C-alpha cells in the first residue's frame, strides 16, 4: 500500500492493516520456499515495519536495503515535499492560489521515484532500520536516483552471503540494546509519530520488552539534533550529504545516548560510525548545541487517552506548548475536513476527530487531509488537533506550530 495514494478515502483504512498482511505474506513465502538468507527491499510506510517484523518472526540471516528517498520538488522557486500538495488544496479553497499554482504543485512536488523527500514515516523507518543495524550505512538516506544507491544494493547482496556463512540471524541484531539505539535515533532526528506504533510492533515480534514508558524516558534523555521537512525546509537528501544516520549516531555516541558495542549486519556500531563525518552543526546539531534538549516525540496520557498518546513535540512552536481552546468534535475525518475547508474552524479551536481508531475507523487511518487543510488555511499556529486515529509523517501542522495528538493505546 502506498499511503500517498490511500489518503482521505476508504483505502486509508487498509493501510495499517497491510503491515500485518505484509509480515504474514513473507512468513508464508519463506516457510513454503526455504531460503538460507533474505534481502528485504522496502520503501513505504507499512512495508518497512512489516518486513522487519517478518525478519524477526522468521529469524533467518537478513539484511535490508531501501529503495531510497526521492529528491525534493521545486514549485515557485521553492523546494517542496509531497505534503505541500495537500496544503495547497487548503490554500486553493481559501483563494490564496489559483489553478496554475495548484497544477504546478501537482506536477512538480514529487519529481523522482523514491519514498517521499522528507522525514515522513517511510524515511523515518528506513533510517531506524539503519539505526537498529539491519542495513548498510546510507541505506536510510541515499537518494533513490543516485548511482550510489545501485552500489549500495550490490554491497548489500555481497553482505548477505557473509551473514549466511556466519549464521548471523535477524534476532541477533534486533536486541533490546539495538532497539534502544533506534529509539535514541528516533528522538534525535524528529521522526514520524508512527514510529512509536511500528517500533512497539517490531519489539513484540522479536520478543524484546519495550513499553511506552521506555519511549517517553528515552525522549526525556535524548536531545533532538535534526529537524527535517515537514518541520523545516531541510530534506533527507541534505541529511545524506552531511553523513546521514551514521553521523547522527556518532554524535549521539559522544553524548552517551547509544551503545556502540552492539552487533549490526556489518560489524559493530562502533565500526560503522568510525568512518562517518562529525556533525556539521547545521543539519545535524551537536549534543552541546541541540535543537532541543529532549527528543522529537513525547508520550502523553490523560482522561482523553488513558493508555497513552503521542505528540511530535519537536515540531511545535513554543507558544503552542500551553494551549487552551474551544473543542469542536467531529465523528470522522471527512466531517472535520469539510468544517476546516468551509471555514467553520477558527483560531483558538481544538479540532477533535473521533471514531478513527483501530476499531472505529476501522484501521486507524492517518489524518493528513485535515492537518494539511489546517496549514493551507493558515491556522497551523492557532488550532490544535486531537484524534484517536494516526498522523501522517507528512503532517506538519505541528511543524507550523499547531499541536497534533494521536492516541496509541
Question: Where are the regions that the model predicts?
Answer:
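Catalytic or ion-coupling anion/metal-binding cores of large enzyme and transporter domains
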Residues: 10-11, 15, 48, 54-59, ...
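Long, structured ligand/cofactor-binding scaffold of large enzymes
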Residues: 1-66, 356
Amino acid at each position: 500500500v502506498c499511503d500517498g495514494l490511500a489518503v482521505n478515502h476508504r483505502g486509508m483504512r487498509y493501510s495499517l492493516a497491510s503491515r500485518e498482511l505484509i509480515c504474514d505474506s513473507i512468513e508464508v513465502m519463506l516457510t513454503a520456499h526455504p531460503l538460507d538468507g533474505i534481502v528485504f527491499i522496502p520503501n513505504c510506510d507499512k512495508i518497512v515495519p512489516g518486513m522487519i517484523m517478518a525478519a524477526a518472526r522468521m529469524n533467518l540471516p537478513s539484511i535490508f536495503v531501501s529503495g531510497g528517498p526521492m529528491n525534493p520538488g521545486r514549485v515557485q522557486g521553492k523546494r517542496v515535499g509531497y505534503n505541500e500538495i495537500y496544503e495547497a488544496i487548503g490554500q486553493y479553497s481559501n483563494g490564496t492560489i489559483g489553478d496554475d499554482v495548484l497544477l504546478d504543485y501537482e506536477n512538480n512536488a514529487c519529481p523522482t521515484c523514491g519514498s517521499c523527500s522528507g522525514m515522513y514515516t517511510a524515511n523515518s523507518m528506513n533510517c531506524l532500520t539503519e539505526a537498529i543495524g539491519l542495513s548498510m550505512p546510507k541505506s536510510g538516506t541515499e537518494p533513490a536516483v543516485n548511482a550510489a544507491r545501485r552500489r549500495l544494493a550490490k554491497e548489500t547482496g555481497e553482505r548477505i552471503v557473509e551473514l549466511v556463512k556466519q549464521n548471523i540471524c535477524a534476532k541477533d541484531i534486533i536486541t533490546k540494546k539495538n532497539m534502544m539505539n533506534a529509539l535514541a535515533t528516533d528522538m534525535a532526528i524528529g521522526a514520524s509519530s508512527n514510529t512509536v506504533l511500528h517500533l512497539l510492533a517490531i519489539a513484540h515480534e522479536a520478543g524484546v520488552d519495550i513499553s511506552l514508558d521506555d519511549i517517553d524516558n528515552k525522549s526525556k534523555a535524548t536531545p533532538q539534533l535534526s529537524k527535517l521537512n515537514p518541520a523545516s525546509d531541510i530534506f533527507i537528501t541534505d541529511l545524506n550529504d552531511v553523513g546521514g544516520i551514521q553521523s547522527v549516531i556518532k554524535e549521539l555516541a559522544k553524548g552517551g545516548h547509544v551503545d556502540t558495542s552492539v552487533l549490526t549486519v556489518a560489524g559493530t556500531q562502533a565500526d560503522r560510525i568510525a568512518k562517518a563525518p562529525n556533525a556539521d552543526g547545521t543539519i545535524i546539531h551537536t549534543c552541546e548545541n541541540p535543537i532541543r534538549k529532549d527528543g522529537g516525540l513525547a508520550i502523553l496520557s490523560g482522561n482523553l487517552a488513558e493508555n497513552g498518546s503521542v505528540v511530535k513535540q519537536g515540531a511545535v512552536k513554543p507558544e503552542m506548548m500551553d494551549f487552551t481552546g474551544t473543542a469542536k468534535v467531529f465523528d470522522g475525518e471527512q466531517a472535520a475536513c469539510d468544517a476546516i475547508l468551509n471555514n467553520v474552524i477558527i483560531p483558538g479551536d481544538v479540532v477533535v476527530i473521533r471514531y478513527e481508531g483501530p476499531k472505529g475507523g476501522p484501521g486507524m487511518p492517518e489524518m493528513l487531509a485535515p492537518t494539511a487543510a489546517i496549514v493551507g488555511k493558515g491556522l497551523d499556529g492557532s488550532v490544535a488537533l486531537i484524534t484517536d486515529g494516526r498522523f501522517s509523517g507528512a503532517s506538519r501542522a505541528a511543524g507550523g506550530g499547531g499541536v497534533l495528538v494521536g492516541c496509541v493505546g
